[in-house]
């Protein structure tokens, strides 16, 4: 049977380090409160002229170089994003043009903070089916474009970044079975205050908002159940895992999820949020990139990754670290 695996990673983090002290005035808060509630010390934000295409391209170049691949080797580009203002052509098409892909499947998807896990799922299926052989999967978002500095629910979490992974065919399973789904009954729990088209009729520029307490409960209790489903369907025990890479929503969610899943003390848990912030579609690949750069011995080891966000939607799978 044909499988797929991740062979390389690439990352782009915003050029600016934005510390809590820069944000606390408008929300009448403190550095201590933000650290305690979210774990964030600073977050990465891009310069005003930097686009999601620029960010995705930068991450892609590192992934290609790390895999020692040529652009013409890639026959599938999948991009997960919620912040592509250009809409069409897709970010995938723009990245393909910039890196010099000759002929490839080019596709963007929108699944918010679960987007990268959905994209890995799709790339894995396409490689298994023989439709593609080498895939470039990217998660990228520039959330700083949707910040209300007066908002106390989510503004201080938001950051900018891009993470890329290259998948190839494999004789052994490198991407496990995926569990994914959604609960649209909680559609209003997190999202934009309006649409960009509303601006044409005089409405204010949309910004992100969330119902923090309901998101926390859903992320911890429901995603713990989903994580256990992922392990069960892949016949993996918590003790088999070497790493846990959840969406970098906030540190309290990450810690509580790990506790509910029953992870053992030796499992390395991604905490990229502390100095990168919440980058939505990019958070899982950035967290994986950071984790493996700091712990090279994780290469070839088993990780559980799970994304969850606006919709409310979720997706996750086990992966062998590149």
From Swiss-Prot:
The active site is at 113, 247, 278. GO terms for biological process: fatty acid biosynthetic process. It catalyses: malonyl-[ACP] + acetyl-CoA + H(+) = 3-oxobutanoyl-[ACP] + CO2 + CoA. InterPro entries: ACP_syn_III_C, ACP_syn_III_N, Thiolase-like. Its EC number is 2.3.1.180. Pathway: Lipid metabolism; fatty acid biosynthesis. It is an enzyme of class 2 (transferase). It is found in: Cytoplasm. GO terms for cellular component: cytoplasm. Residues 248-252 are annotated as: ACP-binding. The last Arg residue of the ACP-binding site is essential for the weak association between ACP/AcpP and FabH. Belongs to the thiolase-like superfamily. FabH family. Catalyzes the condensation reaction of fatty acid synthesis by the addition to an acyl acceptor of two carbons from malonyl-ACP. Catalyzes the first condensation reaction which initiates fatty acid synthesis and may therefore play a role in governing the total rate of fatty acid production. Possesses both acetoacetyl-ACP synthase and acetyl transacylase activities. Its substrate specificity determines the biosynthesis of branched-chain and/or straight-chain of fatty acids. This is Beta-ketoacyl-[acyl-carrier-protein] synthase III. It comes from Tropheryma whipplei (strain Twist) (Whipple's bacillus).
